Amino acid sequence: MAPYHRISVRVQATLSRHMNGHPAQILRRLIAVLLLVCAAVAAASAQDASPRWRALVVDTFNSRLGSPDDISTVVARASATHVNLLYVQVRRRGDAFYLDGSEPLPEGVAIEGGFDPLGDLIAKARAAGLEVHALLTLGPVWHLSTAPADPRHVFTRHGFQNGRAVEGAENWLTRTLQPDGNGTSMEGYRFGNDYWLDFGHPAAAAYVVDLVTRLVQRYPVDGVHLDALHYPEAPAGSASIGYNAVAVARYQARTGAPGLPGQDDGRWSEWRREQITALTRRLTVSALAVRPALVVSVSGVATGAAPGDPRGTVAYARTFQDWFRWAADGSVDVVVPQVYRAEHLPATADEFSAWMAWLQGAPRVRPLVIALGAYLNSLEGLLRQSRTALAASGDNGGLALFSLAANNAPVVTNPLSSPAGRDTPQRPFEDVASALRTGRTTSGQLVDQAQAAGIFASTVPRPPTPWKDTAGYVLGTVEDGSGAPVDGAQVRLDAAGVPAGPADIVTDGSGVFATPAVTPGTYRLQVVSPAGGAYTSDCTVDVSARGVARLTLVVEASRAGVASCR
C-alpha cells in the first residue's frame, strides 16, 4: 500500500470533522490538513539526515538509575535508537536523582550509597554523543498515602504533617473548592494520587527557581526540561483550582475583589495564567544567567481536542498554561507538546491528526519537539505517529518518545497490523530500537507495510539554537520605598522612546520580573504600579546577546514618576 493511500484513510475523518463553518475557515483548515499529508508523505519516502531533535524520555518511575550498571544500560539503549538527547527525570515528586542538599533521594528506590546518578549519566552519555537534559517535574510533590520518611521533604514541611494540612502561609499546596469524592480527596488538596504546589504562592515559586538554578550551577547538563509547570487538571472538566489561601489573598489585594473568586471568573483565570507565565520566564532567565548556552524546554499540556483557538484548550483554560504564547515570544527555548494518543483507536487517532495539523501551522519563533505516548501504542502505531510528528514539527523541530522503559504496548485486534486485525504483542526493546533505525524488527519483519525505511536510519545532531546569538534578557525586582516587593507591577522596556518589549511582563509575589527574549540594545524601563502610578527608570539597562541584565527598581511616592535604579 502506498504511503499516501494509508495516510488518507485517517485524513478523511479529520476533514469531515472540519467541514462545518464559514467557507474561508473551511478552506484554511483543508489547506492545513493537506499540507500535513504532503509533508508526511515526503518524510516517509526519504531519510531525513538533517539535524532534528530526537529525544527519549527516561522516566524514573520505570527506569532504574541506582548504579553505574543501570546508567550504562540506559545509555546503551538510547544509543541503539539513534536519538541524540535524553530528557532524564531527575525530580519525580519532591525528590532528587542527584546529590542535592535540599531535597532527599527518592523513597523505595535502590541507589548505591554515595552514588550520583545524574553525574554518572552526564559523563557516560556525553561519551556516547548524547545530550542530557534534566527533566524536573515541578508541580506534583507527593503521591503516596504514607508521609515521606525524610523530614526535609517539601510535602512534610509545606503540605501535610501528621495527616493534617499545614496551616497558614507555610502551606504551599494548591487546592480545589469542589467537595471531595470527584477525583479529589484530602480536603481538595489531592488530585488523583498527587499533591501539587500552588505557584501563586510566592514561596513555592521561589523554591522551584532556587531548585533549578542550583542544579544548573552544580551539573553541566545540556538543558533543563520544566515538566508539569502548570496547575493540575481539576476533575469533571472544571477550573476549580488555585485556591491556596496565600494565592487568593494576593489576588484579592491586587483586584480588590471580595470573597473567593469563582472558578470561571475571567480576572481570576487571567491572574492564574499570569502566575505560570511569570514563573516560566523567571525559571528560564535564572537558568540562562548561570549558563547561556543551556537549552530550556517546557512540557506543553495537549490533552483534549486540538485548538481552533488556543484559548479553548485544556492547557489555557483549565491548567492555565499558555505555552502557545511562550513558543511565539521566546519565553523558553523549546516547547514540547505532550500529544499522547493511541493510534489504533479511531477517536484518539483523529485527535492526534487534528493536533498535528494545528501544530504544523502554529505561530512560533522557537522549535516544537512533539512528545508521543509510545507507552500507548503498538510498534506499528509508534512509527506512524513518529513520521507524522516529524513532518508537523517543521525543519527545526523533532520528537520525544515517552518513554525509554514504556516504549510500546500490546494491542488486541490491531487495525495497523499486517494483515489488519491481528493481536500484536508488546515487543522487546531490541525490536523497538531496530524498527526506529531500520523499519524492521530484529528478526527482519517489516513493521509498517507502507514504509520500509526507519525514521532514525542514521545518527544526526540536534539542531543549532541561533536565536541565542541575537537575544538577551532582563531579570529584575520592583520594590517600594521600604524595600517590600511590589506585587503585580507592569513592566515595559522602552528603546529610544518607543515601547519595545512585550506588554505582559508583570512582577510576581516576590516583586521579581523576567522578560522573554528581547533584542540586544539599551533600554529604559517603564513601571506601572498596581495602583496605577506610572514610573520611568532613572537609568538605562544594556541588554547583550546571550546576556542577562539585572537591576532593582524602587518606586515610592516621594519620587513621583521616577523609578530609582539599584
Regions found by a protein language model. Name each.
Residues D70-D95, Y219, V332-V334:
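Catalytic domains of carbohydrate-active enzymes, especially glycoside hydrolases
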Residues R250-P310, A315-S378:
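Glycoside hydrolase catalytic-domain groove-lining segments
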Residues W323-F324, S331-T348, W358-P464:
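Substrate-binding cleft of secreted/luminal carbohydrate-active enzymes
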Residues V474, D480-A500, P520:
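Short, ordered, surface-exposed loop/turn motifs in non-cytosolic proteins
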Residues A495-A517:
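Short, acidic Ser/Thr/Gly-rich low-complexity loop/linker segments typical of extracellular
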Residues G521-G532:
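A short, solvent-exposed beta-strand micro-motif common in secreted/extracellular proteins
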Residues P530-S558:
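Structured interaction patches on ligand/partner-binding surfaces of diverse proteins
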